[in-house]
């Protein structure tokens, strides 16, 4: 089953629902959905849709939603059956990100989008070959 994330591009939402991107863009304008700039894309045309309760309710009432059996409700958490199986580094990174402010998280996301993981590791002085 597919899962709606809390932020999606128009292309991702259109693909999930099986409609055209133009249809999703029209819904954004008509319904006044909240959007934000997509980090790392020049020109300001790429936008992220903030999938809130208003968006979820509208999507659930569309015929496209009912004709798509692979779609679940937004923001449903995936059950983690083996929480202790994660590597310590993974847990530390997640904890660090959880402790960041929204602005700090956005800056990290922009940096990773712009520079990539290799430059991120290089900034941390971590050698890939080791």
Swiss-Prot record:
<protein>
    <recommendedName>
        <fullName>Uncharacterized protein YfeD</fullName>
    </recommendedName>
</protein>
<dbReference type="GO" id="GO:0003677">
    <property type="term" value="F:DNA binding"/>
</dbReference>
<dbReference type="InterPro" id="IPR001387">
    <property type="entry name" value="Cro/C1-type_HTH"/>
</dbReference>
<dbReference type="Pfam" id="PF07037">
    <property type="entry name" value="YfeC-like"/>
</dbReference>
<dbReference type="InterPro" id="IPR010982">
    <property type="entry name" value="Lambda_DNA-bd_dom_sf"/>
</dbReference>
<dbReference type="InterPro" id="IPR010749">
    <property type="entry name" value="YfeC-like"/>
</dbReference>
<dbReference type="InterPro" id="IPR009061">
    <property type="entry name" value="DNA-bd_dom_put_sf"/>
</dbReference>
């Amino acid at each position: 089953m597919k899962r709606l994330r809390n932020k999606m591009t128009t292309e991702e939402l259109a693909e999930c629902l099986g409609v055209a991107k133009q249809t999703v863009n029209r819904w954004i304008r008509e319904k006044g959905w909240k959007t934000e700039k997509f980090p790392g894309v020049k020109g300001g045309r790429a936008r992220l849709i903030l999938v809130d309760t208003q968006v979820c309710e509208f999507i659930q009432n569309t015929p496209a939603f009912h004709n798509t059996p692979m779609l679940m409700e937004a923001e449903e958490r995936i059950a983690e059956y083996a929480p202790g199986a994660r590597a310590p580094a993974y847990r530390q990174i997640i904890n660090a990100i959880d402790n960041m402010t929204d602005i700090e998280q956005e800056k990290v996301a922009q940096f990773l989008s712009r520079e990539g993981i290799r430059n991120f590791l290089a900034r941390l002085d971590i050698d890939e070959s080791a």
